[in-house]
Every structure is written in structure tokens, then in C-alpha cells.
Curated annotation (Swiss-Prot):
Keyword Membrane: no
Feature: compositional bias, Low complexity: 58-70, 572-583
Pfam families documented for this protein: HTH_NPRL3, NPR3
UniProtKB keywords: Meiosis, Signal
GO terms classed as biological process: cellular response to amino acid starvation; meiotic cell cycle; negative regulation of TORC1 signaling; positive regulation of autophagy; TORC1 signaling
InterPro entries: HTH_NPRL3, Npr3
UniProt xrefs under PANTHER family: CGTHBA PROTEIN -14 GENE PROTEIN, GATOR COMPLEX PROTEIN NPRL3
Domain of life where this protein originates: Eukaryota
Basic residues: bias regions: 45-55, 129-138
N-terminal signal peptide: 1-23
Name of the protein this chain belongs to: Nitrogen permease regulator 3
Length: 731
């Protein structure tokens, strides 16, 4: 499988509703009416379907269903429906699992299709929700939560938390929290429910299980990823919302009976399939909800579903907002997708963030918010939604600027940083905004290789309406396609600064340009390697000699203790030893003299035998380098001069107190600990000023001293002993 990141691909074929009552399982409803033919599966039942143009077909199906078809087509569809009815009992048993699958991921594979659901069973006490102790709140309220994407993944959770799991869309006209008038209607629903339970209690409590099954056809190499994303974001949340309504108003069972009644009536009158489905969608809110989920999710859109006047939910698979890869020859291209390696959440950006947190849940405080549509339009939608977050969202949107990071907006507006991150995360999740590195005039931007040139004509007209008095879109793209230079060089004057930043935001929003970012790694020269090698060998020799010296002292003390016993034999022993040594040709053993079996063994514990000392190396992760690379780094730092030496071409005398050269005067040994963690080849150096709260000019002077040559600093002549970086620039 290619490493290229892919946009959401639901691979959705159909949605099935199964319920189980005292009489047994029942196949209640499915959409679309003929899923195999509509998704192109009938022609190739043993392989992958040739195309996945089902989204357009499903979107157009509603109009064709409502308008009807010819009588011949209706008869054929009715005949097909009657044939499929004979196999309904098979699907009923297959998709109706045992109680052990309660609130767990249920998955069945048949050929290329996967049937995935989240079965919900009635509790042993006959209720659908655990009864909590009543405190001040006596009425259950739908708490779908306007940030459903913050749900902690897991299949088994407390029932009280499940109400918060289903995601909602604050920017939709439907709100999740019931208003006072809605609560009154909830009370009337409960009273009517109590009356109906008294009249027909046997039927009301007869359902024991329901299962909304999603039929999927994912590519083989992406099977687990596609199944998991639609299960976590759609299947589980939709089933939890239905469970909430079932516990509150017996919703699923009532709708299942209503759908069955309409189908029986249509069967008696020989109603066509298209007419039947039009009637079901118009008269059953559950059938309409399933239809809405299928139509929107299969098209990778947001599905806003209203289950009742009090409860509405919004479901989606989080969209892919950017990609760090260009598509290869065998990959599907997605022109217009933002091409960048900038990730709104990385361990370096936010060390306190949970590594298991999804990228769209927590945004780094040093990122900024780029609205994907006009601010006035978004504010209008927010005010129309009337949700609990509406006032806070409106206030934050008015304060937000793509040139200011979340931390800077928090300091300027007084809004807590955690609140800003939550609101920005909400806007990003619901496709209203994008998290980007803050726009700056010293940054470099260029035309994206992934821009969609097929939309250039349409984009030019829209650009002309937005910026009628400024250079045209082709001229701006042509200027940005030249030699890379800071964006500020394109701004004619300070009066044009705001307008040109608006142009840059517009270009980024449409994927026309992207930021040229700089990355660097520390280069270790052969000279550094040899110096460390010699130092390590000296340490080994010193260690060996110190060990041998201690043993010599021990042997010498023993020898002095034995001299009193052997005073009479000294002469004879000495002469015999000398003769023996001369005959054998061996050297006379003396205390402390080197013995043949006592060799110098260098441990080389820090040395890699495969490391070449004649070639340079790059250190991948200097902030957590292994022992040998740490010694290399120490040797590099030890060679930095105590007093920086530099000169500027064209200037003979430079004032040492001139703030323009502040980054050139400080000793590199003092600056090194601040910068070293960014020299890993993955963290862009453009983020250093933002994260370390330093001036950009000072930062780039320091980086230039370290060997990162850019056009703006090439006039500075620096000390070669400090130039230890290898740089590369890309998106």
C-alpha cells in the first residue's frame, strides 16, 4: 500500500436495520433499495467492483425515487423485492447476534463485503438505560455534546457517558441541548408514552435488541483502516443516539413497527419499490435518518440527522485536510489538497499531549486558525444554530486572525488558551477552519505542486471579485513561482500589508500555495569522529593502566611479606633463575612486568564497528542521541569559540552593541541547548521563533552561524568551526 495519506473513503454499500422481539429477529429496513446494483457489485460478485461512483448515484436516487419510474421498471423492482424477501430470514439470523455482543463491535465478512454493527440489548430489568440516582435533574436530557469527536475510543463505556458520545454540529440549525419549550414537549412525550404503555404494555416492551448494520466494501489493503474509521465515527455514535431515544421514548421499536406497517400495506396494494421507499422516507423519521446517513456519508459529507424535535446529531468521517506526500504513478491524485508537513499536533509541539489523541482533537498552541469560508457566513451560521457554544464561538471567530497563534490570541483577547484550543478544534472538526502555522511576512511561500490547475479559470473569477484592485491570480501565482523569497518582499508598502495577507490566506485556503519550510540536521565531520575515537581509546588505556597499577601494588606488598623467609636463598635462587631464563630464552618475570596472557582489550562499548571514521555522518535525533553520538555532540560544542568572530561584507567597523547583530554576538555554547532539539530533520526551523518567543531575525542569525545559509544572511562571514548544520527546504 502506498504511504500517501488518503481522504475519507467510506466504502459504504448499504445500511440495514435489524430488531429482535419476543417473536424472533426481524429484517426491518435497508437502504438503498438495491444496494448491489447501485454500487456496481452485481457485475463482479467475486472481485472488487470496477468503480465507486455510488455517491453520485445515491445522491440522485432521492429525486428519482420521489418522481417515480416507468411501470415496467416498477414491476421489475417489485419482483426483485419479492425474491429478496425469501432470503430475509437468513439475514435476520446472521445479523442478530447473541447478548455477548452487547455494545461491542460486531463484524461479519462475506466475500468482499463486511457487515459491521454495534448491537444494543435491553437490560435484564427491562429498561434500555441504567437508572442513575436522581439529584437535581429528574428529566433525562440529550447530552450529545457539541464536541463528539473528543470521544475516548473504546467499545465498553458507562451508559451515562454514552449520551455524550454522539457528535453534533453546532453550526447546523439543530441544537443538541433541549430548550425550555423542548423540555415541555419532552414531558408531553413521556406522558403519552405512559398512557400507551398502560394500553398496550405487552407490545411496548417486546423488543429485546436492535442492530444497525453498515455494509462496507473496503479495499483489501486498507480494510482495517476503513472499517475502524467508519465504526468509530459513524456506526457507534449513530447506534448510541438510537439507544438514547429508545430508552427515552421507545423510539426504535415504534419506528420499526411503523416501517413494518407501511411495508405490509405496500405489499397488499402491490406498490412499487421506488414509491414504497419514498413513502418510508417521508413518513418514518428512522428511515429518513438511515437514508440521510447513507447519502451523506457515502459522499464524504456531514450527515445531519434529526431523530426527534429534541434530538439531532451530526455524523462524519473527519476529513483529510493536508498531505505530506505527492501522489506516485500508481496513486490516486487529489489535486487541491493542502501539501505540507506541518502537523497541528506533534510530540515536539505539545509534549504534554496524549500520544493516542487524534490529530483533530487537540491543536498545538503555536498554530493559528484559517477560516475556510467567509467570516460573515460562518458567524451567521453560528448565530442561527443557537447552540451552547454559539456565543463563545462567535466571540472567538471575531478575535481570531491567521497571523496570530492560539497563544497570542489568548493573550490579546483574554480568552483562556484551553478554551481557544477547544473552539478551534471544534471548527476544524466540522470543516469550518484549518489549523496552520501563523502567516508571517518573513516566511517563504510558493505555488503548491498539488494545486488544481483545472479550476484556475473559476478561481480567477472568484479571486477577481474578492480583490478587484490588486494583482490578478495568474500574476500572483507567477510571482510566487520564481526564486523563493520572503512573502514580505511582494508587499509594496505598509498600507498594502493587510490586503496582501488576505490574498495569502485566500491562496492557502484553496491549496494554491504552500509554505517553503527549512529543516536541518547536525553534521559530524571525520575530524570530530577521529577526535572522539582517540579520546575513547585514551580512556580505555587509562582505565586499563589504573587497574594494572592496583594489582602491582597488591603483588608488591605480598612480596615484601615473604622476604624474611627467603633471605638465605636469595643468591642461589637468583643465579638459578638467571641460568634458567638464559636457557629457555624467556625474560625473567619481574613484579609488574607485562605478561603474555595479560593483553589490552578495548571494550569499544561506545564504538560502532560499522561506523566509518573517514566519512561524515548526520545525527538523526540530537535531543536523545545514543552514547557515541552524544560524545560527538560534546566534541562539537567544545570546539565552539568563547568569543564569536564574524564580519559583514561592506562594513569595516561594526558596533558591538548594535541590536541588528544581537544573534551574532552571543556565545554559541549558550545558545546550543535551545536550538539543538529542532535539528532532527522533521521540525521546521520556522517554528523556532514562535515556540521559543524569539525574534525571527535573531533566530536566523544564529542558524546562519551554524551553517544554514539563506539568501537574506549570505552577506555575513562566520567562523567555520561553528558551521555544523546541513539544511534542506521543502513543504
Amino acid at each position: 500500500m502506498s504511504s500517501i495519506a488518503r481522504p475519507p473513503d467510506p466504502c459504504l454499500v448499504a445500511i440495514i436495520l435489524i430488531v429482535r422481539s419476543r417473536a424472533g429477529p426481524r429484517f426491518v429496513f435497508h437502504y438503498p433499495p438495491n444496494p448491489l446494483s447501485e454500487n456496481g457489485l452485481r457485475a463482479a460478485p467475486k472481485g472488487r467492483r470496477p468503480s465507486r461512483a455510488k455517491s453520485a448515484k445515491s445522491n440522485d436516487s432521492s429525486s428519482s425515487e420521489e418522481s417515480g419510474s416507468t411501470s415496467d421498471e416498477d414491476e421489475e423492482e417489485a419482483h426483485a423485492q419479492s425474491q429478496n424477501a425469501s432470503s430475509a430470514d437468513v439475514w435476520e439470523k446472521l445479523l442478530s447476534p447473541s447478548r455477548s455482543w452487547h455494545k461491542r463491535r460486531f463484524e461479519v465478512g462475506i466475500n468482499d463485503l463486511a457487515f459491521v454493527g454495534w448491537p444494543v440489548f435491553v437490560r435484564e430489568d427491562g429498561t434500555w438505560r441504567k437508572q442513575r440516582r436522581k439529584k437535581k435533574k429528574t428529566k433525562p436530557e440529550w447530552e450529545g455534546g457539541e464536541l463528539g469527536h473528543n470521544e475516548i475510543p473504546g467499545d465498553v463505556r458507562d451508559d451515562a457517558d454514552e449520551a455524550i458520545a454522539a457528535s453534533t454540529e453546532t453550526l447546523s440549525p439543530h441544537t443538541m441541548t433541549a430548550s425550555e419549550s423542548q423540555r415541555a414537549s419532552m414531558g408531553s412525550i413521556r406522558s403519552s408514552r405512559t398512557l400507551s404503555e398502560m394500553l398496550d404494555g405487552d407490545d411496548k416492551d417486546s423488543m429485546t435488541m436492535f442492530n444497525v448494520v453498515f455494509v462496507l466494501d473496503p479495499p483489501l489493503l486498507e480494510y482495517s483502516m476503513r472499517i475502524r474509521e467508519i465504526y468509530d465515527n459513524i456506526i457507534k455514535k449513530f447506534a448510541k443516539a438510537l439507544k438514547w431515544e429508545q430508552a427515552r421514548t421507545d423510539y426504535v421499536w415504534r419506528e420499526a413497527q411503523h416501517i413494518s406497517h407501511i411495508k405490509e400495506k405496500a405489499k397488499e396494494t402491490r406498490t412499487s419499490v421506488n414509491t414504497l421507499y419514498s413513502e418510508l422516507i417521508n413518513h418514518s423519521s428512522l428511515a429518513r435518518a438511515i437514508y440521510t446517513v447513507y447519502s451523506n456519508i457515502s459522499a464524504s459529507k456531514i450527515a445531519s440527522v434529526s431523530l426527534s424535535p429534541d434530538v439531532s446529531i451530526s455524523l462524519q468521517i473527519p476529513p483529510l485536510t493536508s498531505t505530506p506526500y505527492l501522489p506516485g504513478p500508481g496513486d490516486k491524485a487529489y489535486p487541491g489538497l493542502w501539501l505540507t508537513t506541518a502537523d497541528s499536533v506533534t510530540p515536539a509541539d505539545d509534549p504534554t499531549a496524549d500520544e493516542n489523541t487524534a490529530p483533530h482533537q487537540v491543536l498545538a498552541k503555536h498554530f493559528a486558525l484559517l477560516l475556510l469560508s467567509d467570516e460573515a457566513t460562518i458567524l451567521k451560521d453560528v448565530e442561527a444554530s443557537g447552540g451552547a457554544l454559539a456565543p463563545a464561538l462567535a466571540h472567538y471567530i471575531r478575535c481570531s486572525k491567521p497571523t496570530k497563534s492560539f497563544a497570542q490570541i489568548s493573550a490579546l483577547s483574554g480568552i483562556p488558551l484551553s478554551t481557544i484550543q477547544m473552539l478551534a478544534s471544534h471548527l476544524v472538526y466540522w470543516r469550518r477552519a484549518r489549523a496552520i502555522p501563523p502567516l508571517h511576512q518573513r516566511d517563504v511561500y510558493f505555488v503548491s505542486p498539488n494545486c488544481d490547475l483545472s479550476k484556475l479559470e473559476v478561481a480567477t473569477a472568484a479571486y477577481q471579485l474578492a480583490f478587484p484592485t490588486l494583482p490578478s491570480l495568474p500574476k500572483m501565482l507567477s510571482a510566487l513561482s520564481g526564486t523563493p523569497r520572503p512573502y514580505g518582499s511582494f508587499i509594496p508598502s505598509k498600507d498594502h500589508k493587510e490586503a496582501y495577507f488576505a490574498i495569502l490566506a485566500w491562496l492557502l485556503r484553496g491549496g494554491w500555495v504552500t509554505q517553503l519550510r527549512t529543516f536541518a540536521r547536525v553534521k559530524v565531520s571525520p575530524e570530530i569522529k577521529m577526535a572522539v575515537e582517540r579520546a575513547l581509546r585514551r580512556e580505555e588505556v587509562d582505565k586499563y593502566l589504573s587497574k594494572q597499577g592496583s594489582s602491582i601494588l597488591s603483588d608488591h606488598s605480598k612480596h615484601n611479606g615473604d622476604t624474611s623467609k627467603n633471605d638465605d636463598d636469595d643468591a642461589s635462587s637468583s643465579s638459578s633463575s638467571s641460568l634458567a631464563s638464559q636457557d629457555s630464552g624467556e625474560e625473567t618475570p619481574m613484579p609488574g612486568r607485562y605478561k603474555p596472557d595479560s593483553k589490552l582489550h578495548l571494550s569499544h562499548s561506545l564504538l560502532d564497528q560499522d561506523t566509518s571514521l573517514k566519512t561524515a555522518s548526520l545525527i538523526l535525533f540530537p535531543h536523545r542521541a545514543p552514547p557515541l553520538e552524544s560524545r560527538w555532540l560534546d566534541e562539537i560544542v567544545s570546539r565552539f569559540p568563547k568569543q564569536p568572530r564574524f564580519s559583514v561584507r561592506g562594513r569595516a567597523n561594526i558596533d558591538e552593541n548594535d541590536p541588528e547583530y544581537a544573534g551574532l554576538r552571543t556565545a554559541m555554547k549558550d545558545l546550543w541547548p535551545v536550538y539543538i532539539k529542532y535539528f532532527n530533520g522533521m521540525d521546521a526551523l520556522e517554528k523556532v521563533p514562535v515556540r521559543e518567543n524569539l525574534k525571527r531575525k535573531l533566530v536566523w542569525q544564529v542558524l546562519t552561524r551554524l551553517g544554514l545559509v539563506t539568501g537574506s544572511q549570505s552577506y555575513i562571514e562566520l567562523d567555520p568551526s561553528e558551521q555544523v548544520l546541513i539544511g534542506v527546504r521543502h513543504w
